[in-house]
Amino acid sequence: MSGSRQYGGRSGADRVAERRRRFVAAGLELMGTKGIAATTLRGVAEEAGLAARYFAESFPTIEDLHLAVFDSIVAEVEERGLAAIADTEGSHRARARAALSALADVTLTDRRKGRIVLIEAVSSTALGPRRLAEAQRFAGIVAGLSGSETNPQTLDVQLAAQFVIGGVAETLTAVLVGAITIDREHLIDKLNELLFASLRAVRATAGTVRTG
């Protein structure tokens, strides 16, 4: 019953949800500026302005917070990407470009988010498997956008889509860290061009007999 008590017009559940939101926001700030290794329970509590004892009501471990922050960014990418696809009329190419635009906007506009999903997750034992799973899932979306007459479930299409996703991630990382300087529209155009070049190659070789 204590969880339903009202304090300041807010229920216990509302206060727990608000504390969780503040912990996630603090995790985003620290993971995106100092790195995952430096994002500790104590540091997150201090950044959130909350007593450390509240942490356990939302997250069993600090790794669970890391995952929650990562998942929140992926959810934003997916939501914005799918909305962009739905709002774009025309060819598969135009819809794919809209999705790539949404991805670039999330990861490059807020550099904290880009650092977490593109850099920090690679070396994290907690986030690494999740990153791979999400890459495979997004590769499936890319395969479906190909517009290819080839079945998107075939091995060749899946490999090409996975290749494209990896290339997109590495390219965005290079832009994020300043290794490549390019304007937004040119970047998205090139990514889209390379995406469809890879998928065209699959169509061109579909049915080719492999000889070893």
Where are these regions (language model features)?
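Hydrophobic alpha-helical connector segments
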Residues: 68, 83-109
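Helix-turn-helix
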Residues: 22, 30-64, 68
